[in-house]
A protein has these predicted regions:
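Intrinsic-disorder/low-complexity accessory segments
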Residues: 2-24, 28-30, 34, 40-182
Length: 182
């Protein structure tokens, strides 16, 4: 469903960019499955992450393979996609809200099927790194608890609102449906 909503939103971007004569790339491939990319952060938080990559004018003006690219034109593209995002969000409001609601509701079902209750981490030889990781997790509203263990200092329960983000952070997935990406 995330990919379907991404495609629907992309149609608004295409419509708006067509009106100003901008070249763009949409849907040829979405590599929206690897959580190491910043554009997937909204995806693991119940939203729709869309990556916009604007060619740089390298200052005020640059010759490109598609002609002259100016700084004002790059700004115009960014503003245009901002406006198309607002229109898409407004017109797809109910679908987006339903998606977000279902995303968090389904977290409970996913958590009940998990083989693990939580994740323990820590390094007795590098307590600072463990502390900093716990601090970062907390900034993302992830529950982290200190433990009395000798090897592991922290515990992150999976049964919480941000369980998909937790799994994205700690999982070491190396198998993908499509292995052709960057």
């Amino acid at each position: 469903l995330n990919q379907d909503l991404t495609e629907k939103i992309a149609k608004y971007h295409a419509e708006f960019l067509d009106k100003i004569g901008s070249l763009y790339y949409s849907k040829e491939n979405y590599d929206d499955f690897y959580f190491g990319k910043g554009s997937t952060y909204p995806d693991v938080n119940g939203s729709i992450g869309i990556l916009f990559e604007q060619a740089s004018s390298r200052g005020h003006i640059q010759q490109s393979q598609n002609g002259v690219l100016t700084f004002p034109f790059t700004i115009k593209n960014q503003l245009t996609t901002t406006l198309s995002t607002l229109k898409a969000a407004s017109l797809l409001r109910k679908e987006l809200l339903t998606y977000m609601n279902d995303f968090y509701f389904n977290n409970f079902n996913l958590n009940n099927k998990s083989k693990f209750n939580g994740i323990r981490f820590g390094n007795e030889h590098d307590k600072t790194s463990s502390y900093q990781l716990a601090k970062i997790l907390k900034t993302h509203k992830i529950d982290v608890f200190e433990t009395k263990g000798k090897k592991f200092k922290y515990y992150v329960p999976l049964k919480q609102k941000k369980s998909r983000l937790i799994k994205a952070i700690f999982d070491t997935n190396t198998k993908f449906e499509d292995s052709l990406f960057y």
